[in-house]
């Protein structure tokens, strides 16, 4: 039986921790067990207590103070230290066999685009710890109001999908913030990104010498055809339930569960 883990990724401020809290609330409300694993050494206080917290091993504030590093350099140091101490992570996660583990990851995409830190951790979780993983890459819905910014996020999501080499879904969070600003028909063109949206606006705002570059980027997005988004309103239980349904399918959660013995009371009632 493999264990199930959800990697929550995305830029800072898009609602990763809010999604983690909403997801664990829903999972627990339907009688399943779940825990949040914090992999952000600079994490702020959370609604739910972290079951496993990288700050128990190393924290960004301590590293910045002792090593005289900046935030990004300190973060890299923290993860290099974690990679040298993966036995600590194995020990912390060792007792959780049939629970849903939600990994709340830092917002710095450099951890998988510039250096293979997160990909290395993912491979270790899969190969040495028996995890069935799914990555959730989150962008916030207001990005659609700035098309170049949205398509920059699409490229980041595609980069994560390619470099992490793990099952993957993409989420457009904070949908309630754009309900009155974006018609449903146009929104569908963002949930299933239409490259023409970017070309039209980018070409109208940039020097003609960049038009070929804009076209090349949109063609690449279209050729890969990998990125689609699921809408999310974190305060809407039905919206969270829909996301969980996708996660269960991707991780084959039901197939990974061992049959449970009926309770004594249930057996007596049948008799």
Curated annotation (Swiss-Prot):
Q: Which UniProt keywords apply?
A: GTP-binding, Hydrolase, Nucleotide-binding
* Feature type site, description Stabilizes the phosphate intermediate: 72
Pfam family example for this protein? ATP_bind_1
The record's subunit annotation is: Heterodimers with GPN1 or GPN2. Binds to RNA polymerase II (RNAPII).
Where the record places motif Gly-Pro-Asn (GPN)-loop is: 70-72
Similarity comment? Belongs to the GPN-loop GTPase family.
From which organism does this entry originate?
A: Yarrowia lipolytica (strain CLIB 122 / E 150)
InterPro entries xrefs: Gpn, Gpn3, P-loop_NTPase
The protein's GO terms of the molecular function aspect are: GTP binding; GTPase activity
Report what the protein is called.
GPN-loop GTPase 3
Q: Which Gene3D superfamilies match?
A: P-loop containing nucleotide triphosphate hydrolases
Q: What does this protein do?
A: Small GTPase required for proper nuclear import of RNA polymerase II and III (RNAPII and RNAPIII). May act at an RNAP assembly step prior to nuclear import.
**What residues bind GTP, as annotated?**
13-18, 173-176
């Amino acid at each position: 039986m493999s264990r199930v883990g959800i990697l929550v990724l995305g830029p800072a401020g898009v609602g990763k921790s809010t999604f983690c809290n909403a997801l664990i609330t829903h999972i627990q409300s339907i009688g399943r067990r779940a825990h949040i694993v914090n992999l952000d050494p600079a994490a702020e206080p959370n609604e739910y207590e972290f079951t496993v917290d990288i700050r128990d091993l190393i924290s960004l504030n301590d590293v910045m103070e002792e090593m005289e590093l900046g935030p990004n350099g300190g973060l890299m140091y923290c993860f290099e230290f974690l990679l040298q101490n993966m036995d600590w992570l194995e020990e912390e996660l060792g007792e959780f066999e049939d629970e849903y583990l939600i990994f709340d990851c830092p917002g710095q995409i450099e951890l998988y685009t510039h250096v293979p830190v997160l990909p290395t951790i993912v491979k270790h979780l899969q190969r040495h710890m028996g995890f069935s993983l799914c990555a959730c890459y989150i962008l916030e819905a207001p990005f659609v109001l700035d098309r170049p910014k949205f398509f920059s996020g699409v490229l980041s999501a595609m980069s994560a999908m390619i470099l992490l080499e793990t099952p993957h879904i993409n989420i457009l969070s904070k949908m309630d913030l754009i309900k009155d600003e974006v018609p449903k028909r146009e929104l569908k063109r963002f949930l299933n990104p239409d490259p023409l949206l970017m070309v039209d606006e980018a070409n109208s705002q940039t020097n003609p010498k960049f038009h070929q570059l804009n076209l090349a980027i949109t063609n690449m997005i279209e050729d890969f055809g990998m990125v689609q988004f699921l809408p999310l309103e974190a305060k809407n239980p039905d919206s969270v339930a829909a996301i969980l349904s996708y996660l269960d399918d991707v991780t084959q959660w039901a197939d990974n569960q061992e049959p449970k013995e009926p309770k004594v009371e249930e057996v007596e009632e049948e008799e």
